[in-house]
Amino acid sequence: WGMDVYGHKDSKLLDGDIKLWIAKGYATSQETATLAKSTYKFTGTPNTELIVDLDTVAKSIEGKAEVLDTRSPDEYAGKNLRGNARGGHIPGSVLVEWKQNAAEDGSFLPASDLKDLYASVNIVSGDEVYTLCQTAVRATHSWFVLSELLGYSGIAVYDGSAIEYANREDTALE
């Protein structure tokens, strides 16, 4: 997601965890890499269509966009506050924990399974969807699944996520 926001379209993501990597016989190393200092400077324009803010998410409660909460069930239910002032979830949001996108070895589920998973909470191709979690890390995983693996358009990350939303007194939570 971050790479796409800043215009880097040819980025790659490891499909699976390190145990799967090793099981497939790929090389690993215990050496610390030495990298040359970079002079790279971003000169483009960030793709703000991939980011939504608090106001946009708050308006979605009454609007047509789906809010996809990717946190744990305990966070969604308000049982685990993760240091936030308040717990719970945005009214009308749906829960698909980010971990549900992957098999036990960390590899992504087949596209047909992922489509079924999201259809079970009424998220389908063509929907406008805003993903969130606590700090927009897990939310980007689900953004990748919806945007890149399933090819859905209209998917954006609420960068402020729960750390912003649940620490304000003027936002609705259930």
What are these regions (language model features)?
Residues V94-A103, G160-E164:
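Short, flexible loop segments at boundaries between secondary-structure elements
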Residues A23-K24, A103-G106, Y165-R168:
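Short, charged, surface-exposed secondary-structure boundary motifs
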Residues W98-V129:
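Helix-loop module immediately N-terminal to the HCX5R catalytic loop
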Residues D116, G126-A162, A166-L173:
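C-terminal soluble interaction/assembly domains
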